[in-house]
Structures are given as C-alpha cells and as structure tokens.
Amino acid sequence: MAAPALRVVRVYLDGAHGLGKTTTGRALAAAASAAGGPVLFFPEPMAYWRTMFPTDALSGILAASARRAAAQGGRADADAAGLVAYYQARFAAPYLVLHARVAALLAPPEPAPGGDDVVTLVFDRHPLAACLCYPFARYCLREINAEDLLALAATAPLEAPGANLVVCTLPPAEQQRRLAARARPGDRADAGFWPPLRNAYALLANTCAFLGAGGAWRDGWDALGWADADALAALADPRGGGREPVPAPALRDTLFAALKCRELYPGGGADLPAVHAWALDALADRLAALEVFMDVSAAPDACAAAVLGMRPAMRRRRADGAAGATLADLARRFAREMTPGGPEAAPRGL
C-alpha cells in the first residue's frame, strides 16, 4: 500500500544579513519533535559560493562593489556593473537548483485522501534574496544598472502554492549594532549596504501584500513619479527613516514604484516597451504566490518558537507519502555539502 500523502509546509527565513536567521533555522530543526511534525533545515549554501569553485563569489562581489564605489556617481560603469551582476547570479544559482529540486517533489494541490502527517521545510533564504532583494539594494547604491536588475529578477522561479516567507527584521539601531559586533573578513557588514537592503525587504513585503489584495502594477503605473537618482539615493541613505511595511500598501509603496525609471523607456519614449511590461508581469506572478509573515527578531530560540507558532496559519502543499524520505535525504545532503567544514563550522551568513 502506498504511503499516505504528506502535507508540506515550506518556510523561507529571509531578511537582511546579521539577524540570526541561520541560528533560528537550526533551532527550528532541533525542534523536530515539536507538535506539528518534523522540521528539515536547508542552510545557506556557503560552500557553493566560497569553496566549490576556484573563485570565491563573496570575495569577488566585495571587490567588484569596491571598484564601483571608487567611481563617480550616476550609472554604474558597464564593466563593473556586469561583474557585480555576474557574482550576484553566482549567489542565486544554488538557491534556484534547490528550489527546482524541491518543487519537483510536490504534488498537484488537489486535496489528498487521508494522510495528516506534516513535514516542515525551513530554508535559509528564498531564491528572491539573490534574484531580487540583494540586487535591488545594489541598484539603489548604483552598483548595477536597471538592465542588470531586470535580468536577475527574470531568473526568479515560479512558485508552487504553499510558500511562506518569514521576513526577519530589527529596529535599525539594533541591526546596526549586531552587524558591527559580528563584522569579520569576508562579511558585507558595512553601514552603507544594510539601509537599502532593509528597504528592499520592506518593499518586498508591501508588494506581496499589495498583490495579495488584488492590486495590479499596471493600474496606476502611468501616474507614478520617476524613480530617479534622488529617489534611489533616498532608499540608500542611512540617515533616512527607511521604508516600513504598511497595513494596506498602495502601488507607490511597492517595488514596482522603485522600478519606474527612465532607463526602461529607450530613446525617451512615452510608452513602456512590451518586453519590460512582461518582465514586470512575471515578477508580479511570482510575488503574488508568497504568503508573507513579519518577524521582529529576538533571541533565536524565541524566534524559532514564534515561527512554530505561525505554522498553523501557513499555507501547505501536498506531496506523495514517498517524498518524505526523499526530502529528508535531500536536506541532509544539502547541509553536508553546503557547509564548509561541517555544519558547526559555517559562517553565520551573508
């Protein structure tokens, strides 16, 4: 007799670096015996970035970013921007591979006969971190250009129903304190990067809420102001108040408003080219599939307990009963291969 179908909860812990996501994910995995079924943790793919290939992607992107910072303002130098975008794509690759592998194990969403067993998959970041949020922060800093950002965003994967994104956040002063405390060679813990990254995640949460409420980027696009150099500089300014998730976001509160730039209108034309509109349509489709939960991070054990408390409200996806063992093996192999020196030796994350 075939094993009863499983109900799979997919949880993506995300947000700016230095918030304790990795530690929280391990705390969740340690809670595998908690009510609600086993928890499988997929850590950050640090080895893929740093040791699996001759070039270290983290060192590479830091060097490319420094090269861009040494240049003058305005559009990023094409060569420097291309190098930053190349390394950013390297960061995305293992997330996209893992995402595709897990998606292949999920069954269609029709109700399953019987089978109340639940398995929770916890991922240290969603592919959107590398395809959209970090690139968006780099775009605000003028490390990459609009064409680079769109190219990276276009690689964001289709999302099967049942994806739950937990955006971890902290008050700006506390986040800055933690980043300063954990700074080490190879970290991107400078004070200039976290403000636009924090804003990227706030805008992401607003965008998902806007789309989830039935909003459409095409409605009101023409009335939006231009996201010019001053607007991007404001998103990158650590002295600003920053953007925050809002209860009922409008189009102006979303990533789409920050993407309305003159670079998308070649030759100064008045109409958005269809290919760019299609790219924004595709991005909207992917973001609309996410259920977003906000988490004001505390100690990792408290965060893990909070995430477990959210689990009953999270979306689920059916999988064949036989997929349970496959998912467990996948989690073990991914953790073993992606953690330099073993799970206990890994850096805390980007």
UniProtKB/Swiss-Prot annotation:
EC number: 2.7.1.21
Catalysed reactions listed for this entry: thymidine + ATP = dTMP + ADP + H(+)
Binding-site positions, ATP: G15, A16, H17, G18, L19, G20, K21, T22, R178
Annotated residues for binding of substrate: Q88, R184
InterPro entries (UniProt xref): Herpes_TK (IPR001889), P-loop_NTPase (IPR027417)
Kinase as UniProt keyword: yes
Key words of the record: ATP-binding, DNA synthesis, Early protein, Kinase, Nucleotide-binding, Transferase
Record field: transmembrane: none
Keyword Magnesium recorded: no
Residues annotated as catalytic: E44
Subunit structure: Homodimer.
Family: Belongs to the herpesviridae thymidine kinase family.
Role noted for this protein: Catalyzes the transfer of the gamma-phospho group of ATP to thymidine to generate dTMP in the salvage pathway of pyrimidine synthesis. The dTMP serves as a substrate for DNA polymerase during viral DNA replication. Allows the virus to be reactivated and to grow in non-proliferative cells lacking a high concentration of phosphorylated nucleic acid precursors.
HAMAP family: HSV_KITH
Protein name in UniProt: Thymidine kinase
